[in-house]
Amino acid sequence: MAVQQRRSSKHRRDKRRSHDALTLQTLSVCKKCGKKKLSHRVCSCGMYGELRVKKAH
């Protein structure tokens, strides 16, 4: 197991952790059925923007 040679400063530690923040997924609303969906995904009603992509269940 590795053993550190010198103690890392708070600044160096925080710079390393600067990219670790979590972000929430953004939701958009379907223009046809009004349900919430993930952006750039086909809605459960079968619409992707203005295009009908698949048949609804």
Swiss-Prot record:
**Per the UniProt entry, what is one GO biological process?**
translation
Sorted keywords for this record are: Ribonucleoprotein, Ribosomal protein
Pfam families per the UniProt record, alphabetical = Ribosomal_L32p
Name the segments for region: Disordered: 1-20
Q: Which GO terms describe its molecular function?
A: structural constituent of ribosome
InterPro entries, per the entry? Ribosomal_bL32, Ribosomal_bL32_bact, Ribosomal_zn-bd
Q: Where is the composition biased (Basic residues)?
A: 7-18
HAMAP family the record matches: Ribosomal_bL32
Family that this chain belongs to: Belongs to the bacterial ribosomal protein bL32 family.
Protein name, per record: Large ribosomal subunit protein bL32
Q: What organism does the record attribute this protein to?
A: Mycoplasma genitalium (strain ATCC 33530 / DSM 19775 / NCTC 10195 / G37)
Q: Which gene encodes it?
A: rpmF
